[in-house]
């Protein structure tokens, strides 16, 4: 903060990140039956390589006065030898997976499993080229059971495990981050009225993750990535997709999430950057006759509840809820001329009214959300 005279200290940040990735996925599907049970079996092997170079230098930004600011002051870039982060990380991951979707009358059962092998090596250029190598493997399974009623209702119960290698490096070259592992139970119901283009769904879930990556900030602006012991998230998800009329389509969604750190220094606090509520609504109206045949417009809103950007859940780390609006226009060029069938153009705008809002705070700084963005695109389908 500024002192009584209005003088304020500043810091400088220089971040340079380069990521390259190669990924390939091969799978084989077989459909067959064993007695009255039909099977769809998927067997696959995937492989990916990721190469990440990350440099972060934090330094002094000089001082200025908020009542009489001087712009254009030169800022000396700190030497690379003083970098807070300066590393190269290579990750190689191979996964073998299998899944069987079974059907017997109105019953549906899915069973699956995946084995992952990961090798990760990190070289710290700011720590005398110290290296850290980690190898890990993990099995994760999934299962789901549902019943398809003739009336359109489909209740289901599912269980899934997850495994994700760490994507950042620790400040300490002697400490490597562990992969993030998770387990989730979900109980829900879906409903599609027979003969309609409407789908309604509701679900409650219980997710537990360990070794979740979090970020904290030090004086001078340096951000430090760490891992928290265990996190639990319980929530409710509602979604509705409906072709209300031949012209009007509506998509609505709502999520309620209660997160809590289960282990570690900040036990009992909310998970960093996890909104307690989220909601969205999108409406699209397309003309199919008349002078506007093929032309459509869309309009919607997105609501994001409050978040804490720091692990301690302090007042300074809290960002309030916000709502932004989006819009779109699109046109089917095939309605203009039959030779253009399959071609269309579209313009999307996010944060349509260019609202200024705070998206996150980390206890030291707050950050504005994205300004209005307008993207035009052309597509062709055949």
Q: Which residues make up each language-model segment?
A:
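Residues that define the transmembrane beta-barrel architecture of outer-membrane proteins
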Residues: 18-22, 90-94, 135-139, 181-185, ...
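Structural signature of Gram-negative outer-membrane beta-barrels, strongest in the C-terminal barrel
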Residues: 19, 35-42, 46-48, 87-209, ...
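Residues on the lipid-exposed face of transmembrane beta-strands in outer-membrane beta-barrel proteins
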Residues: 24-30, 96-102, 143-147, 187-191, ...
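Short loop/turn motifs that connect adjacent beta-strands in outer-membrane beta-barrel proteins
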Residues: 32-41, 106, 150-152, 194-197, ...
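Conserved C-terminal beta-signal and adjacent last beta-strands/turns
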Residues: 40-41, 157, 185, 272-382
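Gram-negative outer-membrane beta-barrel transporters
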Residues: 106, 206, 226-311, 356, ...
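Membrane-embedded beta-barrel scaffold of Gram-negative outer-membrane proteins
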Residues: 155, 179-243, 250-255, 259-262
């Amino acid at each position: 903060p500024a002192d009584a005279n209005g003088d304020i200290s500043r810091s400088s940040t220089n971040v340079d990140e380069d990521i390259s990735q190669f990924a390939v996925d091969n799978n084989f599907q077989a459909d067959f039956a064993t007695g009255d049970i039909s099977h769809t079996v998927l067997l696959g092997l995937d492989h990916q390589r990721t190469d990440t170079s990350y440099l972060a230098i934090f330094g002094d930004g000089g001082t200025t006065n908020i009542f009489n600011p001087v712009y254009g002051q030169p800022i000396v870039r700190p030497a690379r030898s003083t970098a807070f982060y300066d590393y190269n990380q290579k990750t190689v991951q191979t996964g073998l997976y299998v899944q069987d979707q079974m059907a017997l009358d109105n019953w549906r059962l899915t069973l699956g499993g995946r084995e992952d092998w990961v090798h990760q090596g990190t070289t710290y250029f700011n720590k005398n080229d110290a290296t850290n190598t980690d190898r890990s493997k993990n099995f994760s399974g999934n299962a789901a059971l549902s019943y398809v009623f003739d009336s359109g209702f489909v209740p289901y119960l599912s269980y899934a495990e997850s495994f994700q290698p760490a994507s950042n490096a620790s400040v300490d070259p002697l400490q490597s981050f562990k992969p993030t592992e998770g387990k989730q139970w979900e109980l829900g119901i879906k409903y599609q009225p027979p003969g309609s283009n409407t789908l309604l769904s509701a679900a409650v879930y219980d997710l537990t993750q360990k070794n979740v990556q979090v970020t904290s900030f030090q004086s001078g602006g340096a951000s430090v990535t760490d891992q928290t012991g265990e996190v639990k998230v319980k929530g409710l998800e509602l979604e509705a997709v409906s072709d209300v009329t031949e012209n009007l389509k509506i998509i609505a969604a709502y999520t309620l999430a209660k997160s809590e750190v289960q282990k570690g220094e900040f036990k009992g606090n909310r998970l960093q950057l996890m909104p307690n509520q989220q909601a969205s609504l999108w409406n699209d109206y397309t003309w199919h006759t008349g002078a506007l045949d093929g032309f459509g417009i869309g309009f919607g809103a997105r609501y994001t509840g409050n978040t804490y950007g720091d692990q301690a859940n302090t007042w300074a780390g809290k960002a309030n809820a916000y709502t932004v609006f989006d819009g779109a226009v699109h046109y089917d060029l095939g309605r203009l001329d039959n030779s253009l069938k399959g071609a269309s153009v579209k313009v999307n705008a996010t944060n349509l009214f260019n609202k200024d809002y705070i998206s996150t705070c980390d206890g030291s700084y707050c950050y504005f959300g994205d300004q209005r963005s307008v993207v035009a695109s052309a597509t062709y389908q055949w």
